Design a protein with these regions (language model features):
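Short, small-residue-biased leader/transition segments that mark boundaries at the very start
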Residues: 1-6
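Structural WD40 beta-propeller signal
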Residues: 45-47, 107, 179
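Short loop/turn segments immediately following beta-strands, especially the blade-tip
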Residues: 10-17, 64-71, 199-204
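Blade-level signature of beta-propeller repeat domains, shared across WD40, Kelch, NHL, RCC1
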Residues: 172-208
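Gly/Pro-rich loop segments of beta-rich domains
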Residues: 11-38, 72-102, 138-174
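Short loop/turn segments immediately following the C-termini of beta-strands
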Residues: 56-57, 66, 125-126, 190
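Conserved beta-propeller blade signature
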Residues: 50-53, 119-122, 184-187
Length: 223
């Protein structure tokens, strides 16, 4: 593969030029997209069957499906968010609005019947929140923009910990990872210079031997 070619070339004292047009015999151009000069992040689904392309500065995500026959990703198409239309709106597909969507992660949803169904969570940097996208393209706000705390000072941003939607607030969040073993999100709060956590814990009601609803809240982490 290309990885082996790269290693051999560097090991033998050579250089490596990653520009496709300069190396037509090494790289294969799969497709071009409308925003080559903007910031991109690519998130490949755990099954490898599709990927999301996040266009940070133009406020939307594209989706590229994997062609099993050709063994390559096809030209991506607009999936959620409006091309060059920043804003804040929970909605479906291209009707949703976001503002500088940054890092995201796929998280398996056990409520879905399919074994390959994952929700996609991402940080919406200039909307100061964590958003969620279902496989069908339904965009919702998962955490941040505290409905109650924002009433006190009129800001959707802040450093409050607590209930995900009523209390918790973030400021310019740019990073997000998920620990499957701990069932915990780690959120990079850029302006606050902190790593915040969101836990999804399900406590057991010993008396009734039943599960009570999930306790989801944010806390500051020193990890």
């Amino acid at each position: 593969g290309l990885g082996d070619v790269y290693k051999r070339q560097i090991k033998n004292g050579g250089s490596w030029d990653p520009i496709v047009k300069n190396n037509p015999n090494t790289f294969k151009q799969l497709f071009t997209i409308a925003d080559p000069s903007w910031e991109f992040q690519i998130f490949i689904h755990p099954t490898g069957k599709y990927a999301y392309f996040g266009v940070i500065n133009n406020h939307y995500f594209m989706r590229s499906d994997y062609d099993e026959i050709k063994k390559e990703f096809i030209t991506p198409y607009n999936f959620v968010g409006g091309y060059k239309q920043s804003g804040y709106r929970d909605d479906v597909g291209t009707e949703a609005r976001m503002n500088n969507p940054c890092q995201g992660v796929f998280v398996k949803n056990l409520d879905y019947t399919g074994e390959e169904e994952y929700d996609f969570y991402f940080v919406d940097r200039l909307n100061f929140c964590v958003r969620k996208v279902t496989p069908e393209g339904i965009v919702s706000t998962y955490a941040g923009r505290g409905a109650s705390t924002s009433l006190a000072d009129g800001n959707q941003w802040g450093t409050d910990d607590g209930d995900l939607r009523e209390v918790a607030r973030f400021r310019d969040v740019s990073g997000l990872v998920y620990d499957d073993a701990k069932e915990m999100f780690y959120v990079h709060d850029q302006v606050g210079h902190t790593i915040r956590t969101i836990s999804m814990e399900q406590e057991e009601n010993v008396a009734g031997d039943e599960n009570i609803p999930e306790d989801e809240s944010t806390v500051e982490s020193n990890e």
